[in-house]
C-alpha cells in the first residue's frame, strides 16, 4: 500500500526522500506522538474506585518506550517526541510516562475524564463505560509541534485537542501518520458526555488519503465508515476479546487475540496502536504488527491506569521479535510502501507471543496489587 502524498507538493516529497536517505542504517527513526495527558477518575456503583494518569499519549509512550527496537537494548533516549498539554493542576508529573516525556504547561486546567463503569457486561457495540469530559485543556496547535522532520507520527487525541490543522501539520512533518479515530470523531454535549460524529462529516475527512492507518474500536467503526475509509487508508478495528481486523482497498485480515483478565479497559486501544506501531518499526507487515498490538492491548487491561510491564516479559518479547524479523536497513515505517498481508511466520509469531503472555499472567498472579487494586469492570 503506497503512502499517499499530494502530487503537487514536490518540495515535501523531496524532504521525505531526504529523511529516507539520512535515516537509512542510522541510529533510529524518530517519531512524533501528539495528544494530551489527562486526569482519569474511575467510578463504579456510584463510588470512585480509581484515580490515574490518563490520556492516550501516556499509554502510547509507555508501550513505545518498552517495545520499540531503537535504543531498547542500549537503554538509550527514546527515539520519539511527545507533544502533550496539561494545566498547572497536573498531579502526575512524576509518573514514569509523563516524567520521561514532559508535557507543555498552559493556563487552562488539565483535561479530566470521569469513567462510569457499567454493572453489566459490554456487548460488541455497546460500551462498558460512559465517559464524561469534566475539564478540557487547551488544544494542541500546529505551532506547538517541533519544526523538523519525523519518520512517523501518531495522532492520539482524546478530548478534541488534535485540531484538523494540527493533524495536517503532522502529515507535513511525518513520513507516515497513524491516527486513532477517537481523535477525529469524538463530540461532547453540554454535560461533557462523550459521543461520536461521522468521520465523513468532519474537517478531518479530506486528510484521510494522506494517512497510512486509522485505528477504531468496534463501537467507533460505524462512525468511521469502514467501507468508505478503507479505500483511502488501512482501517484497523479492535474487537476486544475477539482480536482485531484490518481492512484495506482490496483485502482484509483477522488477527487473533491474546487472553487477558480485564481489570480496567482504559488505554487498551491506545496500547494496541502503540504496539502496532512498534511492530512496524521492527519491520513486520501490518497484519503481523497487529499481533503485537493485540499483545500490548491485552497487557493494558490487566492493570488500572498506565501499566507496568515485567522486565522478563519485555525481554521475551524483544527476543521473539529479534528472532522473527530480519535485519533491515530501512524498516517499513521509513519506506515507500507497507506490506499489509500476513507473512508466512504469522502463526509462529502468535504462538511465541502466547508464551510471553504466560509471563504476563504469572506477573499478575504473583503481584495482584501491582497497579490494579481490584477488578473495576465487573462485580
Curated annotation (Swiss-Prot):
Its EC number is 2.7.1.64. One of its GO terms (biological process) is myo-inositol hexakisphosphate biosynthetic process. The active site is at 270 (proton acceptor). Keywords: ATP-binding, Kinase, Nucleotide-binding, Transferase. Disruption phenotype: Strong reduction in seed phytic acid, and strong increase of inorganic phosphate and myo-inositol levels in seeds. ATP binds at residues 217, 267-270, 294. The keyword NADP does not apply. SUPFAM superfamilies: Ribokinase-like. It catalyses: myo-inositol + ATP = 1D-myo-inositol 3-phosphate + ADP + H(+). It comes from the Eukaryota. The keyword Kinase applies. GO terms for molecular function: ATP binding; inositol 3-kinase activity. Disulfide bonds: none annotated. Belongs to the carbohydrate kinase pfkB family. Kinase that phosphorylates myo-inositol to produce multiple myo-inositol monophosphates, Ins(1)P, Ins(3)P, Ins(4)P, Ins(5)P and Ins(6)P. Participates in phytic acid biosynthesis in developing seeds. Phytic acid is the primary storage form of phosphorus in cereal grains and other plant seeds. This is Inositol 3-kinase. It comes from Zea mays.
